[in-house]
């Protein structure tokens, strides 16, 4: 269960709140029907090699609140340029093995969350709610929950690269 009030109007910093509202989000947004449809689609998919997705509450909650949103930060970013992203787990539908491999390395279940920059990187969430970015250069830790990950992407905070021992 989340330790914050998802209807609170002061949940995000001003710049993040503005980017979220620009994308169509508002405090209390909750589309469980869409989240359940995504969950069903992921559960039903089996790769040619037999790999399947796992679905868990942290993912469904993130999809229910932020699913379908195209979120873009403005400004120069704190460390790097803000990263536009889309919350839609079906961007990772055909990456069941990749997501499962990350989960094995982390010792937890992981499933797709969305994508950065029109497919430049896959966003994934684990069973504890932690969020990651997977791209051609490696795997990155974006935050301890969806809120922190959104802040990281919208404000241009440099993410931590995952290594064999965890984030650097």
Task: Provide a role label for each language-model segment.
Residues 1-120, 164-168:
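A surface-exposed partner-binding patch
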Residues 125-128:
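Short acidic-glycine loop/turn motifs at beta-strand connectors
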């Amino acid at each position: 269960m989340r330790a914050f009030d998802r209807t609170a109007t002061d949940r995000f910093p001003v710049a993040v709140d503005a980017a979220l509202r620009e994308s169509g989000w508002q405090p209390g947004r909750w589309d469980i029907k869409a989240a359940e449809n995504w969950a069903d689609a992921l559960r039903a998919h089996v790769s040619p090699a037999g790999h399947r997705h796992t679905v868990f509450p942290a993912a469904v909650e993130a999809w229910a609140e932020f699913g379908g949103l195209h979120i873009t930060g403005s400004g120069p970013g704190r460390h790097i340029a803000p990263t536009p992203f889309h919350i839609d787990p079906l961007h990772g539908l055909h990456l069941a093995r990749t997501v499962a491999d990350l989960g094995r390395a982390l010792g937890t279940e992981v499933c797709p969350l969305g994508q950065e920059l029109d497919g430049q990187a896959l966003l994934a969430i684990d069973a504890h709610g932690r969020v990651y970015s997977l791209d051609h250069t490696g795997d990155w830790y974006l935050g301890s929950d969806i809120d922190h990950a959104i802040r990281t992407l919208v404000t241009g905070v440099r993410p931590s690269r995952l290594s064999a021992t965890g984030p650097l």
